[in-house]
């Protein structure tokens, strides 16, 4: 097992500086925004953005459609209201799952979501699976609903299991029966029930669905065809839920669910070594100290078994799945042919903080090198942070889109463009850099040379901002523990320089 910390990364990297000017943009969102997805909504060849928002006073979900002008600039095109009488959604719910898929097979991306019937006073556990259909121009003029009625009891292995909570549904899409139409898998609250119900909504190709519930869960679900039988399967933590011709899923194990003090907080599935079979990378975080995480890398042995190939340990936890779905994603970070992995960092305990992103660059093998760190500090009262990645300006590199929401409801979207040097356009500095920090190591003050700083931020090994200085080239290290720190320096023109500093 290999272990990486931010300090190790800094010591290996040396000084760093920005190459050119990188554009980042900020967009104000409707209050109480909850999650974000990307897709070409209006069929113009450019990736657009969809943001979900929960309007608590009116008990409605709103989807905001942001169209891309082709250069990466976004503009709000439409707000879609999905109101329904007597809906109930918990205000503190940190995510609203939704899907972007062409459910009626007309060539246009539709929006699938769910709404709840008011639980108070209800005798059943009724939810509704809703699809807002796209007319091809980014307008959503009609919708349909399918009732998802949880059975009172599910029999499994000749044992009855009782269900009583419909909230916090998870949604994933895939072709689970091999008919080439996108289906939906939906699960009720994983935490409120000892046993949860996994429902499959099978699409007939027109957007009409038949539903069936059985035992299961969707805790950290990723959909992919793992056994090459032309039917999508679900990887859910340590479990693999294989689709079958009988439509009754078969449960196997990615690995034995060993209690090791780590919880499964993320997962990506892709063909790592190019052999035509999908492999699995699982993210696991320490839920005791909240300081460390692992990447477990598994090779698909082609017989529905997997071999653990590597374990990469690193500092800082992965954001908990209950707080932010899809905390691990595949990303084209450096423009080569190998998929990379981006991970959102932050304490999985809600309200405890977000710290930025790690990128593990793929190389076609089952070993990943030291991660690239992109710090993005926690905002005051930040409640929800979700992200997605896509190539907004069609330059061959995926950009980073981060949605923030505060407890007060204030929400905004931050876009970081990747010009080939990363989201912050940071690469290793050379010996001709004019920006330096001295003395280094330091025990009193650090002085920034070669630039007039507008703002200086000092990050510790956990990615937390521990010092902030404006309009000064003098930084006191008083109160800082001995060790390595990352100094981020911004000038008045928006250029970013980064240096490592050791404190003695």
Where are the predicted features?
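Blade-edge motifs of beta-propeller repeat domains
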Residues: 19-32, 67-93, 133-165, 201-217, ...
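Beta-propeller blade termini
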Residues: 34-43, 94-105, 158, 167-176, ...
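Glycine-aliphatic tripeptides that mark coil-to-beta-strand junctions in extracellular
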Residues: 45-47, 107-109, 180-182, 230-232, ...
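Short glycine/acidic-enriched loop and turn motifs that connect beta-strands
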Residues: 54-58, 116-122, 189-194, 285-290, ...
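Short, glycine-anchored, charge-dense loop/turn motifs used at functional sites
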Residues: 459-466, 485
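C-terminal tail/sorting-segment detector
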Residues: 482-504
